[in-house]
Design a protein with these regions (language model features):
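Conserved post-catalytic alpha-helical subdomain immediately downstream of the catalytic base
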Residues: 265-335
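Positively charged, low-complexity intrinsically disordered leader regions
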Residues: 1-21
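A short helix->loop->beta-strand "cap" motif at the edges of active sites that frequently abuts
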Residues: 157-161, 235-238
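Conserved N-terminal subdomain of the carbohydrate kinase-like
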Residues: 49-136, 328-342
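Conserved phosphate/ATP/ADP-binding segment of small-molecule kinases
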Residues: 172-263
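Short catalytic helix/loop segments, enriched in acidic residues and glycine
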Residues: 21-39
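Alpha-helix C-terminal capping segments
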Residues: 31, 38-49, 292-295
């Protein structure tokens, strides 16, 4: 299998039990997760040598986060230790007409102070096949931006395929929007595989087309073949992949996705999901697609693998997707009815 490197923040997640509100909570359930950490876990479970890069504090909470990753076969040997704290986010799980709610407490977390010299990037990217990062990491701080850029450049020096999930988070875009768009747009020259669509590109990269409002306009335009291909060609991606989510309620979603390449546009299977936990669903989708590409499935089968992996993730509490390749393949071959396997 392939050697995959991911870079990002792993956070402590605290959630009231079940569907309780924050105001009701007297205790919290603990999970660990983060966009790139979630991808690292899934790819390790699919059999790849999965290396996670981050900076994590030298305390019991940091140790617990690393222990969680190691227990799922993620290579943590290149994680830098130090800094003040692990980022925290509080998640209130929604239900029916009440949406989920997230409160972040991540200021001055260790990853925001990480520097390129703390990582032996030449050794890390030696013999690597894929590097994955998201648009979350470089906008966390100036230091995180410099680390991300250094990793992107080093990956390309070693001829490593680069995957980038635009992953827009509004709470990280409250200031210097044009500066952040310019910074991420410049990073796209290193990117081969991009997860996003025209709306994500407009928000994160400042992408525009004459006469079209991708941010506030009709969403279907942002994911149709014409405009997906325009984004693909503008940034010279090999693949542009998007999810297609129809939120019927906080508990029930329609789920699908599409992939665009220079010579193909393919919309995948439609799923109807009853949601246990949707956090990490997009990361499971990305990791499933990447596994498909690494396993030479081709873009269409890779998309279906990603959709099925993410569909299963929506049934699992926590950020991480505890599944195997065989379970995903069984889902693809089934009608998704969830019958008991004996």
């Amino acid at each position: 299998m392939a050697k995959v490197v991911t870079l990002g923040e792993i956070m402590l997640r605290l959630s009231p039990p079940g569907n309780q509100r924050f105001l009701q909570a007297r205790d919290f359930e603990i999970n660990y997760g983060g966009a790139e950490a979630n991808v690292a876990v899934s790819l390790a479970e699919f059999g790849h040598h999965s290396v996670f890069l981050s900076k994590i504090p030298e305390n019991a909470i940091g140790d617990a986060a690393i222990s969680t990753l190691r227990s799922l076969n993620v290579d943590c040997s290149h994680i830098a230790r130090g800094g003040k704290r692990l980022g925290i986010y509080f998640l209130e799980n929604g239900s029916s007409v009440r949406p989920s709610s997230v409160v972040y407490d991540r200021a001055d977390s260790s990853i925001t102070k990480a520097a390129p010299y703390e990582f032996n990037l030449d050794e890390i990217f030696k013999d690597a096949d894929l590097f994955h990062v998201s648009g979350i990491t470089p906008v966390l701080s100036e230091e995180a931006k410099e680390l991300t850029l250094a990793a992107l450049k080093k990956a390309k020096e070693h001829h490593v395929t680069v995957s980038f999930d635009l992953n827009y988070r509004s709470n990280l875009w409250t200031s210097d929007i044009e500066g952040k768009q310019k910074m991420l747009s410049e990073m796209m020259e290193y990117v081969d595989i991009c997860f996003g669509n025209a709306r994500d590109a407009a928000k994160c990269l400042g992408y525009t087309e004459a006469g079209i409002d991708f941010i506030d306009g009709e969403y279907n335009i942002c994911v149709d073949e014409k405009h997906m291909r325009n984004v693909l060609n503008h940034y010279h991606f090999t693949h542009l992949i998007t999810t297609l989510r129809n939120s019927i309620s906080a508990s029930d979603n329609g789920w699908s996705g599409a992939v665009c390449t220079s010579d193909d546009y393919y919309k995948g299977r439609d799923y109807m999901l009853h949601i246990v936990d949707r956090v990490g669903g997009g990361d499971s989708f990305a990791s499933g697609f990447l596994h498909g590409i690494l396993a030479d499935m081709g873009s269409r089968k890779a998309l279906e693998f990603g959709l099925a992996a993410a569909a299963i993730k929506h049934t699992i509490p926590g950020d991480l997707n505890y599944i195997t390749e065989s379970e995903v393949l069984s889902m693809i071959e089934s009608d998704g009815a969830g019958r008991v396997q004996r």
